[in-house]
């Protein structure tokens, strides 16, 4: 599962369905008791680890500190249809279009649940929506899909087909033989308010939230989101980390996923090293090193 890197999906769906505004506050009570009678009481990670809560917060702060409780309630109010529509438009559970065989993953929704379980299973519950809203349930995506999704967030809903090939030059670099042009794979009309909510929340994750330690004193403004996902197979949780940068004029999107990597915040240093390489002189793509050529 993608874990909390999925929360931007829920943010967009909740705001653009009119369910919340970016200023709507929800009280984090630690334990989500809406489904207590059914024995399902998920917890916010902060409460699980420290016994504390995030208190009364809006969606931007909830993204920055990765408050599960906020997104349990926002997802419940929004419903799975709106959430799933946003996830699909942003490329999650969809082919990226890369020139290699790829897994398409799957999105948590009633159709997926019906396919995965036998006919005796009695359908989709609101509790399923709550789990899906924080990137759990049946959500399963490839790292490339997470990267494509993050790039679409940076592009305010425009998702491009993924490709490995930028251009083909002659052996002496003097002739352009072929150059790939960007191809739009899908678009999502994201409102100004929803864009402001997730971009500011991801920025705050870096300046004061769960991604802070990896980017202290970093020269480039970064928007990022950490993710920690339970997988049910024992051992540490899976960890994910996504970012785009620069925050105000994005050039690059990065996704890092480590199975049993414990917490997404620990992957920030990996993403930072990639970002540093990209923005360094050595990371320039204007020229092609000889070892990357075919004669």
Task: Write out the residue ranges for each language-model feature.
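Beta-lactam-recognizing serine transpeptidase/beta-lactamase-like catalytic domain environment
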Residues: 1-4, 9-256, 294-295
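Short, charged, low-complexity patches
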Residues: 146, 263-272
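Short, gly/Ser/Thr-rich active-site loops of penicillin-recognizing serine hydrolases
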Residues: 175-185, 272-295
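Ligand-site clamp/hinge motif
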Residues: 258-261
């Amino acid at each position: 599962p993608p874990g909390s890197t999925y929360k931007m999906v829920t943010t967009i769906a909740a705001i653009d369905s009119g369910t919340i505004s970016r200023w709507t506050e929800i009280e984090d009570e630690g334990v989500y008791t809406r489904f207590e009678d059914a024995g399902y009481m998920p917890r916010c990670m902060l409460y699980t680890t420290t016994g504390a809560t995030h208190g009364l917060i809006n969606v931007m702060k909830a993204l920055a500190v990765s408050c599960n409780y906020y997104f349990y309630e926002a997802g419940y109010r929004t419903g799975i249809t709106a959430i799933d529509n946003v996830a699909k438009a942003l490329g999650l559970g969809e082919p990226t279009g890369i020139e290699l065989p790829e897994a398409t993953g799957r999105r948590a929704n009633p159709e997926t649940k019906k396919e995965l379980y036998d006919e005796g299973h009695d359908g989709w519950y609101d509790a399923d929506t709550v789990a899906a809203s924080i990137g759990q349930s049946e959500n399963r995506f490839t790292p490339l899909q997470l990267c494509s999704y993050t790039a679409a967030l940076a592009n305010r809903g425009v998702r491009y087909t993924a490709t490995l090939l930028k251009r083909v030059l002659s052996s002496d670099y003097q002739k352009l033989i072929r150059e790939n042009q960007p191809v739009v794979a899908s678009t999502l009309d994201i409102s100004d308010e929803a864009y402001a909510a997730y971009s500011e929340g991801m920025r705050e994750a870096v300046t004061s939230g769960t991604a802070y330690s990896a980017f202290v004193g970093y020269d480039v403004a970064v928007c990022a989101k950490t993710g920690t996902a339970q997988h049910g197979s024992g051992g540490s949780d899976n960890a994910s980390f996504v970012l785009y940068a620069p925050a105000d004029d994005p050039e690059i999107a990065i996704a890092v996923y480590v199975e049993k990597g414990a917490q997404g915040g620990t992957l920030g240093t990996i993403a930072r090293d990639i970002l540093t390489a990209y923005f360094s002189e050595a990371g320039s793509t204007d020229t092609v090193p000889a070892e990357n050529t075919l004669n």
